[in-house]
Amino acid sequence: MEEHLKKRPQKKVFPKVKIDSLRNQAIEKIKSKLLPDEKIIKITLIGSSVKNSFGEYEPPGFRGSLFSDFDFILFVEDDFEIPKWLDREPDGKPFPDNSMNLAYRNKKFIEDKYDVEVFFIRESNAQNPAIQKLGEEAGIPMTSDSKHKHIIVYSKD
């Protein structure tokens, strides 16, 4: 696990009904902002909203927010252009090659409170077994038999 992830403050988990509602809002909004786009292969949601541990952090919060964020993984064609409404997230570094660490964030994406983090994985990298292994080790569901809990939000196929 990345070092900064170990230093999170305590979190008060929201009731499941609230998590489900917020998660559905985030899924609908990400789809409305990104689709249709022929260069998007798959959109996957991972993290606390899928594991039912989404909630509010004790001050000072984590990554500039008092709340959990929504973690989307986008598998895209190699020539996909990352949308301008997303800002680069310098802390998202699961891969040793920094050119592959395409982590982006949009602050207050849902209800003016909850951030979205979007991590892009280019198709040529997604098909590389060594990169699949690194991604899986970092908690990213890279393969169809991944052990990591996730929701497939969209798939081109």
Q: For the regions a protein language model found, what residue spans apply to each?
A:
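Cell-envelope/extracellular polymer assembly enzymes that use nucleotide-activated donors
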Residues: 71
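Catalytic core of pol beta-like nucleotidyltransferases
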Residues: 1-67, 75-157
